[in-house]
Design a protein with these regions (language model features):
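Gly/Ser/Thr-rich phosphate-binding loop
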Residues: 1-26, 122
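Active-site glycine-centered loops adjacent to acidic/histidine catalytic or metal-binding residues
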Residues: 10, 32, 78, 103
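Conserved ATP/PPi-binding loop(s) of AMP-dependent carboxylate-activating enzymes
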Residues: 30-36, 44-68, 104-106
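AMP-binding/adenylate-forming catalytic core of the ANL superfamily
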Residues: 51, 57, 79-139
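A structured beta-alpha segment of the ubiquitous adenosine-cofactor-binding alpha/beta core
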Residues: 72
Length: 139
């Protein structure tokens, strides 16, 4: 059809765009470069975003607001990294961590990403069951 699909990244609290790939500025696996005027930093693998488009807070919920807004930075709850060209890559979700009995934190998205590179794997979901990491793989 000749339609090119480009990834972007945004959330409601940030009205809504944080990063976007563009026709001439794109990178495979990335959600794009951070929007003009916006700032991203990574703290403990979590994506933080700062811009005048970020919400002021959650309506009548100062407790949650205080958890996600600190010194003007919005804590997205998403894991990722910026490369040297300022392209943002999403690697997982903070709330998706599997915590094993030995205290080890495992990101299911990292394992899923690796498994998807295997021949014959079309879809995969990684989860915890009985303190073991399990995967359902669909060819």
């Amino acid at each position: 059809m000749g339609i090119e699909v480009l990834n972007g990244y945004g959330i409601t609290e940030c009205s809504p765009v944080i990063a976007v790939n563009r026709n001439n500025y794109k990178k495979d696996g990335s959600v794009g470069q951070v929007i003009k005027g916006g700032k991203v930093k990574i703290v403990d693998n979590e994506i933080l975003f700062k811009d005048n488009s970020v919400m002021l807070g959650y309506y009548k919920d100062t407790e949650t607001t205080d958890m996600v807004l600190k010194k003007g930075w919005f804590y997205t709850g998403d894991y990722g990294y910026l490369d040297v060209d300022n392209f943002l890559f999403i690697t997982g979700r903070k709330k998706n961590l599997i915590i094993l009995s030995n205290g080890e934190n495992v990101s299911p998205e990292v394992i899923e990403s690796e498994l998807l590179h295997e021949e014959g794997v079309c879809e995969v979901i990684v989860y915890a069951k009985d303190n073991k990491i399990m995967a359902s793989i669909y060819p």
